[in-house]
């Protein structure tokens, strides 16, 4: 969903370039992301971080991990970064990229990222837009290029068609997962929901009684 532009967004991002890295700067940061954090720790990336509820929640819950939220919409990334800054200041383990998630290998080198999150991505339902889905094979190639051997992609969605499509895409690419890392109704499973950090969309769909599909797949 495209957000209405906020008049303050551009100036705020420019004033907080230590927190939000633009796409151009991100490509220059390849292999050096640990320098932007307080200390070297595993890096987890959310592609399509929206207004940032998930990535902020994860950064607060896991100070032992460095998190990067990647978002293409200026308004969304500005809202996310300002919200976290206003709530808790500059977190030592949270940064954002204002840029396109297409081609993450231009931002990170091999094994620089430990894990990738895809949360409630645009389903792009029309067949002619298949290549835009974040679980399409070319995206999987990009993820594999920055993750370590057997690196993990965690995917959540409310869209059954996109979930089924993604399962097939993962399988065709040779990815694998344990039966315990797969669910067709996340919030109906007391064990699987432990440690789950909800996104804004997740809360919205839960309120409507819609099931949330989730899988953690490995290369």
From Swiss-Prot:
GO terms under cellular component: tRNA methyltransferase complex
Keywords of this entry: Methyltransferase, S-adenosyl-L-methionine, Transferase, tRNA processing
Active site, per annotation: 122
Molecular-function annotations in GO: tRNA (guanine(46)-N7)-methyltransferase activity
EC id: 2.1.1.33
Classification via HAMAP family: tRNA_methyltr_TrmB
NCBIfam families listed in its UniProt record: PRK00121.2-2, tRNA (guanosine(46)-N7)-methyltransferase TrmB
Family listed: Belongs to the class I-like SAM-binding methyltransferase superfamily. TrmB family.
Name used for this protein in its record: tRNA (guanine-N(7)-)-methyltransferase
Natural source organism: Leuconostoc citreum (strain KM20)
Lineage: Bacteria, Bacillati, Bacillota, Bacilli, Lactobacillales
């Amino acid at each position: 969903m495209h957000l209405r532009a906020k008049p303050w967004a551009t100036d705020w991002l420019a004033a907080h370039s230590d927190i939000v890295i633009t796409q151009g700067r991100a490509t220059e940061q390849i292999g050096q992301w640990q320098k932007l954090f307080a200390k070297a720790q595993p890096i987890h990336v959310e592609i399509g971080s929206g207004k940032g509820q998930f990535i902020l929640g994860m950064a607060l819950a896991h100070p032992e991990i460095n998190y990067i939220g990647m978002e293409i919409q200026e308004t969304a990334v500005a809202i996310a970064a300002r919200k976290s800054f206003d709530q808790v200041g500059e977190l030592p383990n949270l940064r954002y990229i204002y840029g396109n998630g297409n081609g993450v290998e231009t931002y990170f080198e091999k094994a620089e990222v430990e894990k990738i999150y895809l949360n409630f991505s645009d389903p792009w339902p029309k067949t002619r837009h298949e290549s835009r889905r974040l679980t399409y094979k070319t995206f999987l190639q990009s993820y594999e290029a920055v993750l370590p051997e057997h690196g993990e992609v965690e995917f959540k969605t409310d869209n059954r068609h996109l979930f089924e499509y993604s399962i097939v895409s993962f399988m065709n690419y040779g990815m694998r997962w344990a039966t315990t890392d797969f669910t067709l109704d996340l919030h109906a499973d007391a064990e699987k929901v432990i440690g789950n950090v909800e996104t804004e969309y997740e809360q919205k769909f839960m309120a409507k009684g819609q099931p949330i599909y989730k899988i953690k797949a490995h290369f």
